[in-house]
C-alpha cells in the first residue's frame, strides 16, 4: 500500500525540510540509511521466449513476475484478457519480432545495470532520510515496451524502468512518425540512460506530492511545480539542474 501524504502534513514536512537542510550540493550523508533493492530483468526473460510455444512460457513468466506480467500484457501491450490464446500468441510474436532490434540495442547499452541501480538506490536513501515513514520500493523491474507507450512507472513496491525509453536521443526508433507524434523531440532528447534515476525519483515525488488538478491558476501551478522540483533536488543532490527540470 502506498503512503499518500495529506496536503497539510506535506506542507509541514516541506517547511521542516526547507529550513533544516544545509545548502549542500552533495546532500546529507545517507550511507547509514539501509535500503534493500533488487533488480530483475524482465526483458531478458521475455525475449528469450520460444515463440513456437509462447502461451505456456507466458504463463510461466506470470509466476515469476506475478503482478508485473499481467500489467505488462494488458496495460503496456494492450492485450485483452478475453482474446483467444491464438490471437494473443500472434500479437506477442509480432511484438517480439518488431522489437527484437530494440532489445538487442538495450542488451548492449545495459549489459551492466548496476550503475543505474546504484544511482536509484542513492536517491531512495535520500527519500528515506527525509521521509522515514514512506514505504520505499525494494524492487526494480526493467522491460522493453512500445516506444510510443509507457516509460518509467512506479507501482506498488517496485520501480519499473522502460529501457526502450533510454537508448540515446539519436536512437533511430525515436525519429519515426509513430513515436514523434507521442513524444516530440524536446522529450526524446531526454531518452538517455542518465535519466533513469531522475525519472524514478520524479515518480516518487509525484507519489509523495500528487499534482493538484483542481486549482488551475498559473501561480498555484508554478508553486506546486516548484515544490516538487525542490524535493527532486533533495533526492538527487549534485545532479545537473537541467536534468531535474520538466515537471
Label every model-predicted segment.
Residues 1-9:
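Bacterial N-terminal signal peptides that target proteins for export
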Residues 8-12, 32:
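Alpha-helical interaction segments
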Residues 17-20:
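C-terminal motif of bacterial Sec signal peptides marking the signal peptidase cleavage site
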Residues 22-92:
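N-terminal mature-domain "stem" immediately C-terminal to a signal peptide or N-terminal signal-anchor/transmembrane
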Residues 91-247:
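Acidic/His-rich structured neighborhood in mature extracellular/periplasmic domains
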Amino acid at each position: 500500500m502506498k503512503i499518500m501524504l495529506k496536503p497539510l502534513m506535506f506542507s509541514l514536512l516541506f517547511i521542516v525540510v526547507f529550513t533544516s537542510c544545509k545548502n549542500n550540493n552533495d546532500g546529507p550523508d545517507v550511507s547509514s540509511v539501509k535500503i534493500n533493492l533488487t533488480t530483475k530483468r524482465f526483458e531478458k526473460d521475455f525475449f528469450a521466449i520460444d515463440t513456437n510455444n509462447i502461451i505456456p512460457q507466458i504463463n510461466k513468466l506470470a509466476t515469476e513476475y506475478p503482478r508485473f506480467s499481467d500489467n505488462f500484457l494488458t496495460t503496456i501491450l494492450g492485450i485483452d484478457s478475453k482474446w483467444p490464446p491464438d490471437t494473443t500468441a500472434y500479437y506477442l510474436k509480432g511484438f517480439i519480432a518488431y522489437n527484437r532490434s530494440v532489445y538487442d540495442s538495450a542488451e548492449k547499452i545495459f549489459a551492466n545495470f548496476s550503475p543505474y541501480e546504484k544511482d536509484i538506490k542513492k536517491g531512495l536513501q535520500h527519500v528515506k532520510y527525509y521521509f522515514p515513514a514512506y514505504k520505499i520500493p525494494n524492487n526494480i523491474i526493467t522491460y522493453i515496451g512500445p516506444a510510443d507507450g509507457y516509460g518509467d512507472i512506479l507501482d506498488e513496491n517496485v520501480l519499473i524502468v522502460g529501457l526502450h525509453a533510454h537508448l540515446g536521443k539519436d536512437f533511430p526508433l525515436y525519429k519515426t512518425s509513430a513515436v514523434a507524434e507521442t513524444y516530440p523531440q524536446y522529450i526524446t532528447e531526454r531518452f538517455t540512460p542518465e535519466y533513469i534515476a531522475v525519472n524514478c525519483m520524479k515518480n516518487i515525488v509525484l507519489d509523495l506530492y500528487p499534482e493538484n488538478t483542481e486549482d488551475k491558476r498559473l501561480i498555484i501551478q508554478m508553486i506546486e511545480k516548484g515544490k516538487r522540483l525542490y524535493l527532486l533536488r533533495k533526492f538527487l543532490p549534485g545532479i545537473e539542474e537541467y536534468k531535474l527540470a520538466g515537471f
